[in-house]
Amino acid sequence: MPVIKVQTNVKKVSDGFEVRLAIHMAKVMKRPESQIFVSLDMNSRMTRGQLTDPLAVLDVTSSTVLTPILTEEYTVALCEFFSQELALDSDAVLINYRSLSPELIGFNGHILTENRPFISTDRARFIIGVLGIAFLAFLLQFLKYI
């Protein structure tokens, strides 16, 4: 459940910016749109050194492990999005990534680990398949004696 917090001093952010960001990042992160949370704080007083040019600072928090490969992919996608939407150069966008353990995130009245299955669907299918084959082998051996 990624959470993307955006702070910017850009004066005019078009309506629906946060929705478009959620849709864009759902595709990039390969997650359902309903799992992407976006918070937008516009017209923040911001500076980089003595410069007060338009900037954006993002905090991206996720319950999945964030690897350098993923954060590079996300950074490219976010910088392209902010360039198109807010006309910000990539050096005007700072992104802080945080990976939290699922038990540190609460949603829908529970922590995320409570909503996860004990084993994955693929693993369960594999186990059921192996048990089915073992049962058939046993049954064939049993039928030899009848």
From Swiss-Prot:
Signal peptide: none annotated. GO terms for biological process: regulation of lipid storage; regulation of peptide transport. SUPFAM superfamilies: Tautomerase/MIF. Gene3D superfamilies: Macrophage Migration Inhibitory Factor. GO terms for molecular function: cytokine activity; phenylpyruvate tautomerase activity. GO terms for cellular component: extracellular space; nucleus. InterPro entries: Macrophage_inhib_fac, Macrophage_inhib_fac_CS, Tautomerase/MIF_sf. Pfam families: MIF. It comes from the Eukaryota. Belongs to the MIF family. This is MIF-like protein mif-3. The gene is mif-3.
